[in-house]
């Protein structure tokens, strides 16, 4: 078991590094390493909290990009389910491909990362279908963690919607809050 765990982590680490290179070479913004470290610590703490009650955790991510954050979070524990929304069809397709590639060695991220394509405002507020016809019922779920990494000028709007989707002990993480002043100007 120990050997399989090490192989799995080595594969994921290697693949995530390839994703980082792709993001840099193609000017795709992904979460910074320091920020990711904090996010992963928060996810690990939530997993520990929920283990006491024998429950998994649900994460909502706005802004999938290439799937880098989703894969990182999902790889922590097999009891993590992620709903992630991406507006760009190009990014959605890249993320889907990345998630399928990393879905090996018993980590099963593909079945625990639910990807949706479309406008987050619509998909967050009503039971509907996304742009590829997949049923979306995010508005009726409760989340342990919401990670907002989408259109920076809309953070306050996203926050106001997402706070109603949190469990009582849930947390919202906003990436790049100081990004070029887009978020601060709204406050």
Language-model-derived ranges and their functions:
Residues 1-145, 152-173, 177-187:
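A short alpha-helical cap/connector motif
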